[in-house]
């Protein structure tokens, strides 16, 4: 039988504004401001998705010495994805700002400028010169190859992007899209 003693410690995730006490209407204003910053950048902006995600995590850790540590952790993140298209080509730009804090993090960011910058980048990469393909040696550390594949290819293969016609892989079922030496299985 153990006698548990709570351990006091310095909490690193103290917050000033609990996101779960802020009315939804105020949270919507944050994502609307982000959206408004992006929407008028160019007529080539065809889609803007903004999100605000706030989490509250209760953590309890116990050990065999009878010590118990309890904490509540908050994470807040605001995100924007902008799709630019010229009718032939399409480019997507994603960016986010987040902290292990409450909604006081919004005091540190100009959401209009953040949205505008993301939209400008989407348009800029839409008009960027094509990369010149070339063969280069690649060495991938064991275990990390999946992450590289995911970031390079799998985001474009996600069903929602393909179904909405936002992916370079749209309408490619049955077509060869990679080298014969590449095998990728999504299970």
Stretches found by the model and what they are:
Residues 1-187:
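Active-site bordering "gate/hinge" segments
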């Amino acid at each position: 039988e153990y006698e548990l003693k709570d351990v006091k410690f310095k909490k690193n995730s103290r917050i000033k504004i609990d996101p779960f006490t802020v009315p939804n209407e105020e949270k919507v204003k944050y994502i609307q401001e982000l959206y408004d910053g992006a929407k008028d950048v160019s007529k080539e902006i065809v889609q803007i998705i903004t999100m605000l995600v706030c989490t509250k995590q209760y953590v309890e850790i116990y050990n065999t010495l009878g010590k118990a540590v309890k904490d509540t952790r908050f994470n807040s993140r605001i995100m924007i994805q902008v799709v630019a298209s010229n009718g032939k080509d399409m480019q997507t730009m994603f960016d986010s700002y987040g902290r292990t804090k409450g909604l006081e993090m919004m005091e540190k960011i100009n959401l209009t400028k953040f949205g505008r910058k993301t939209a400008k980048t989407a348009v800029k990469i839409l008009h960027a010169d094509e990369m010149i393909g070339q063969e280069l040696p690649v060495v991938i550390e064991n275990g990390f190859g999946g992450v590289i594949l995911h970031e390079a290819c799998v985001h474009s293969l996600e069903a929602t992007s393909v179904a909405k016609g936002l992916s370079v892989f749209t309408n490619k079922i049955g077509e060869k899209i990679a080298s014969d030496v590449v095998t990728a299985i999504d299970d």
